[in-house]
């Protein structure tokens, strides 16, 4: 255990030697919101928007495979590049080993700019060492012509497009410029070239939207969740594929329930990470004892990451309720500050909850794990 702690502390020190900056944004009105639970529906809508692009396309993506889904996106991009659209792609090359170098080299030959998150030539020494052992660019950003933006949990691969359930949101309007500015932060850190000029965006709707972006060592998400839980008066519904929150967020969930807020958590019965199955199960009796209602989905794996509270605030993005998302990875989320958008997210949550089983106090903790081992799992996951 001491060895793991030492390694983690060394990595954290290396992060601190290479500070990163991320822009902060205020809520902006004049947007429209569209959301889907279907990977295929997302892909079809995205391909339509790509086909209609006139000037620029930016993508910052965690996972971009060279399979059927990935090639559909690539082919659409190739077509637009040949038409003169400026395309920039930032991809986490650590998590996309299924896409060989020539796959992205083909994109470069078509005139696209492709940069890797773990670009050792662009990193300071500390960050270069830490990158392969620590942070991932978990963002899933697409911005088209500076006025349309997408984010959510869906990657460009067959599994997340055609098999899993997930939530993806599309905004159109001035808030898309915030997502583009967040992309520019990563691009400036890891790629060559000056930032693209800003594109004026006219209001097209009524949604009040705020972009939230984080980098390693950032405390933004912890403060955000603690604040929104403290502000909740009637309910706070949260869906996440993984549950291993920072202590402050776990306590904020319990405190809200103790005040009489209807706090509900929803996650899959089994996730794609066996380690996280054990960790998530370990929390369930503790959550129920604190007055939090826990719902488990046992159908097709649902990878959604969202919350909604009091019909007034909601969020959807790439953020899992775990230590990596809150402290280590690069993440993004959209906050919706208007009632209409919050109700859309609420409806999505309740539709999934209707297919869930509510857990009770008899739910067993992770089988086969001693108390000491469960405690160790919690601690090590918060650190890494």
Please place each PLM-identified region on the residue numbering:
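Bacterial N-terminal signal peptides
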Residues: 8-16
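Bacterial N-terminal signal peptides that target proteins for export
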Residues: 1-7
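Charged, low-complexity intrinsically disordered terminal segments
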Residues: 4, 16-384
């Amino acid at each position: 255990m001491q060895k793991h702690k030492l390694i983690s502390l060394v990595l954290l020190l290396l992060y601190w030697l290479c500070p990163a900056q991320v822009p902060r944004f205020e809520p902006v009105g004049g947007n429209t919101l569209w959301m889907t639970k279907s990977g295929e529906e997302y892909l079809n809508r995205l391909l339509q928007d790509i086909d209609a692009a006139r000037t620029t396309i930016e993508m910052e993506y965690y996972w971009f495979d060279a399979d059927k889904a990935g090639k559909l996106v690539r082919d659409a991009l190739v077509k637009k590049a040949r038409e003169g659209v400026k395309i920039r792609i930032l991809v986490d090359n650590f998590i996309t080993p299924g896409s060989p170098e020539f796959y992205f080299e083909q994109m470069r030959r078509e005139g696209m700019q492709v940069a890797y998150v773990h670009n050792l030539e662009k990193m300071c020494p500390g960050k270069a060492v830490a990158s392969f052992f620590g942070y991932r660019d978990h963002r899933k950003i697409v911005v088209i012509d500076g006025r349309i933006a997408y984010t959510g949990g869906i990657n460009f691969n067959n599994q997340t497009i055609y098999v899993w359930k997930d939530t993806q949101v599309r905004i159109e309007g001035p808030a898309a410029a915030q997502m583009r500015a967040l992309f520019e932060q990563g691009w400036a850190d890891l790629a060559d070239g000056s930032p693209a000029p800003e594109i004026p965006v006219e209001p097209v709707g009524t949604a009040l939207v705020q972009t939230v972006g984080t980098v390693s060592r950032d405390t933004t998400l912890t403060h955000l969740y603690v604040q929104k839980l403290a502000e909740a008066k009637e309910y706070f519904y949260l869906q996440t594929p993984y549950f291993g929150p920072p202590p402050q967020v776990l306590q904020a969930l319990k405190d809200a329930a103790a005040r009489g807020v209807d706090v509900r958590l929803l996650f899959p019965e089994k996730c794609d990470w066996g380690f996280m199955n054990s960790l998530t199960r370990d929390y369930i009796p503790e959550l129920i004892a604190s007055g939090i209602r826990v719902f488990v989905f046992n159908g097709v794996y649902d990878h959604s990451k969202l919350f909604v509270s009091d019909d007034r605030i909601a969020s959807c993005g790439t953020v899992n309720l775990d230590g990596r998302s809150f402290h280590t990875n690069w993440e993004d989320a959209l906050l919706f500050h208007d009632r209409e958008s919050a109700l859309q997210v609420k409806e999505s949550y309740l539709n999934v909850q209707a297919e869930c089983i509510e857990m009770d106090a008899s739910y067993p903790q992770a089988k086969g794990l001693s108390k000491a081992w469960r405690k160790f799992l919690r601690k090590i996951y918060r650190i890494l």
